[in-house]
UniProtKB/Swiss-Prot annotation:
InterPro entries: MFS_dom, MFS_sugar_transport-like, MFS_trans_sf, Myo-inositol_Transporter, Sugar/inositol_transpt, Sugar_transporter_CS, XylE-like. It holds the Pfam family Sugar_tr. The gene is csbC. Could serve either a nutritional or an osmotic protection function. Coiled coil: none annotated. This is Probable metabolite transport protein CsbC. It comes from Bacillus subtilis (strain 168).
Length: 461
């Protein structure tokens, strides 16, 4: 097999877990329309069917990070692919609401695990020059999975075949299981375990030959300086600001409302006045736009930088949601405002998927030292899943109590807050190796802590 072919297969299969996450997230919006035909649903149980995936994801995120730091990225991907298959088939063959909810929890374990692990694996496999571009592949796979789910829902809706909708998630899961044969272990994890020659062999596939020895030297130097355990690193005071930034990124990525659009797009369009068929087309349009803008982000992220994209993204999503809310508040619901809803949500998707959607997945693993990258990324992904769960549970209640216009106004205020967070808190990591980022952040936050201590000592004297 040619070197370039092997390299692209590594990247493709490394990111495939993102497609499964996207599919399992998006498919439930169509399946919910017909589950009630076989399994009676109440308002409560319908909410549980959606949200239990996210509950499972919280635990999956926490477990996969620590496990991948201990046993390696590749072995954990193998386990996750099996859980994906079991969860998808269990959902398809569920006969009671209890079985369906339990199956969604199992599926959520794999969803959360892949959400935490895929960005780490891609960031550690990528050469510095294209790490941002490659890191956005995770989000590209997520939105591609969502689009596939929308298409499958559309195709199977005439047959009311919800079991096929959810069960087809097993197909890419089997593909991931096969693809593990092409996925080597992360070179950084191997260096951490003392397997330098194996790391060099893998980097010969993925890296420019002239950069290999320099990057290996950086990895070895970084590991030589790390005598602490994973838990010890996470407890270190200098890493707390990094964790807070990671947690902030995770919360804002979800709190600006993206998954309410993914989960409830048909409901939003129907509330805004569109018919069933038009709502389905509008939803599919959002799925296509997701993919297009994520590809745009892949082109921009290593040229423009992470921080600038987040800042401009916050401006765009704030204005689009505020404008949408203003139109609905002043003009009410009509045929014209229904299509304006589609347009403004489209603008929102353009800005979100070119910025906050993919950039957060790239930044989270970049922020943390290699000794604790899996565990720290797992923790921030846990927070992301929890924020996703809270927003998805609260959205229907807000929609019922406030109306769609005021709901979008609330999200626009949160988007405005994300601007200040990105501007003042988020560091730029473009063009730096993971070891350079770690050294820079450690110096920045240790220096800040040292300055604070000096001021306190002077005041005491």
């Amino acid at each position: 097999m040619k070197k370039d072919t092997r390299k692209y297969m590594i990247y493709f299969f490394g990111a495939l877990g993102g497609l499964l996450y996207g599919y399992d997230t998006g498919v439930i919006s169509g399946a919910l329309l017909f589950i009630n035909n076989d399994i009676p649903l109440t308002t409560l149980t319908e909410g549980l069917v959606v949200s239990m995936l996210l509950l499972g994801a919280i635990f999956g995120s926490a477990l996969s990070g620590t496990c991948s730091d201990r046993w390696g990225r590749r072995k954990v991907v193998f386990v996750l692919s099996i859980i994906f298959i079991i969860g998808a088939l269990a959902c398809a063959f569920s006969q009671t609401i209890g079985m369906l909810i339990a199956s969604r929890v199992i599926l959520g374990l794999a969803v959360g695990g892949s959400t935490a692990l895929v960005p780490v694996y891609l960031s550690e496999m990528a050469p510095t020059k294209i790490r941002g571009t490659l890191g956005t592949m995770n989000n590209l796979m997520i939105v591609t999975g969502i689009l596939l789910a929308y298409i499958v829902n559309y195709l199977f809706t005439p047959f009311e075949a919800w079991r096929w909708m959810v069960g087809l998630a097993a197909v890419p899961a089997v593909l991931l299981l096969i693809g593990i044969a092409f996925m080597p272990e992360s070179p950084r994890w191997l260096v951490k375990r003392g397997s330098e020659e194996e790391a060099r062999r893998i980097m010969n596939i993925t890296h420019d030959p002239k950069d290999i020895e320099m990057e290996l030297a950086e990895m070895k130097q970084g590991e030589a300086e790390k005598k602490e355990t994973t838990l010890g690193v996470l407890k270190a005071k200098w890493i707390r600001p990094m964790l807070l930034i990671g947690v902030g990124l995770a919360i804002f990525q979800q709190a600006v409302g993206i998954n309410t659009v993914i989960y409830y797009a048909p409901t939003i369009f129907t509330k805004a006045g569109l018919g069933t068929s038009a709502s389905a087309l509008g939803t599919m349009g959002i799925g296509i736009l997701n993919v297009i803008m994520c590809i745009t982000a892949m082109i921009l992220i290593d040229r423009v930088g992470r921080k600038k994209l987040l800042i401009w993204g916050s401006v765009g999503i704030t204005l689009s949601l505020a404008a949408l809310s203003g139109v609905l508040l002043t003009l009410g619901l009509s045929a014209s405002t229904a299509w304006m809803t589609v347009v403004f949500l489209g603008v929102y998707i353009v800005f979100y998927q070119a910025t906050w959607g993919p950039v957060v997945w790239v930044l989270m693993p970049e922020l943390f030292p290699s000794k604790a990258r899996g565990a720290a990324t797992g923790f921030t992904t846990l927070v992301l899943s929890a924020a996703n769960l809270i927003v998805s549970l609260v959205f229907p209640l807000m929609l019922s109590a406030m109306g769609i216009a005021w709901v979008f106004m609330v999200f626009s205020v949160i988007c405005l807050l994300s601007f200040f967070f990105a501007f003042y808190m988020v560091p730029e990591t473009k063009g730096k190796s993971l070891e350079e980022i770690e050294a820079s952040l450690k110096k920045r936050f240790k220096k800040k802590k040292s300055t604070q201590n000096q001021v306190l000592n002077e005041r005491t004297l």
